[in-house]
Amino acid sequence: MAELLKNLFSKQFVEELTLDLKRHSKNFDDKTFIKNVLDKDWVNRELKDRMHHITFQIHENLPLDYRDQILVLNKSVSKFSGFTGTIFPNFVEQFGKSDEKYSLEALKNYTQYSTSEFAIRPFLKQNPKIIEVLYDWSKDKNHHVRRLSSEGCRPLLPWAMKLDQYVKDPKPILPILERLNNDKEDYVYRSVANNLNDISKNHPELVLDLGKKWTGKSETTEWVLKHALRTLLKKGEPKAMKLFGFESSKSLDIIEFSLAKSKLEIGEFTSLTIKIKNTGLAAKFRLEYAISYLKKNGTHNDKVFQISEKEFAKNQEETLVKKVDFKDLSTRKHHAGKHFISLKINGRAQKKIEFNLK
């Protein structure tokens, strides 16, 4: 994915950016800019390196003070939406930290064309009071700005600087999430769910308490809670299970839990058959299977896969067949040897079988 994004910062993009910046400022040294950007190292530069390299060269070849540079960028930003537009907030991140108020206004503007979620983070680390600005943004009419108020303060945002102060104490974030948990835009409330999921990894009880407070509020908030608690649900946390009505699993009998093959080659797939029956009163069940993958060092690592969540009537019986694939992925390398697969009902492992990869 990084390779694909890297290629968005193409020679054509650099040429278009050069023309547009020159159109908006006669001070811009377009010839030196394009020569220095597309240097001998350009082809080998990775994603973030290309982005930082471009913003550095804008700064070097636009001989104005910072605020006047931003005025020029403000005229160009609307032409470069999407990922390539991140060079504009990146410019603010690299060169605007000593002019907070002006820079924050620029980030608020630029996020409406790409995203300022990465660029805002050094400002939050530098000055924790900026969380109050993000709270104000949570009331903004523009949904991109509202999303930034949540996404920008996620403690563990992927590809981004970790915000240690919120990993340690996420309470300053909560007023923003309280305000946005029922937002009309899914782009916004998805960010709330992801922020809470980040928090749950270090403060599970805090997120569970919020869950009790928010449950039943609306369909949107129910969706937010389910996704906010996804890590705890996969871990089988009983309080998270109970919040969604998944309690005792004793009445669900496992009639069959089997793999079509117990010996497979790496790259092959097989089928998993699950036959179950509810022998008790009607109840909700969350069904998952977990594979214990053999690691290179000889230990095992569990990965949980959801099958379904549904209510079973008394005496209801079901047979489920799932495809289980063992081809290597960019995120998972398989190793020959003993593996395990187990069935989880309402977060509790119920049955485990062994199989071998070769």
Where are the language model's segments positioned?
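Short glycine/proline/serine/threonine-rich loop/turn segments at secondary-structure transition edges
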Residues: 328-338
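A beta-strand/beta-hairpin structural motif
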Residues: 303-329
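Short beta-strand and strand-turn-strand segments in soluble, beta-rich domains
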Residues: 252-255, 296-309
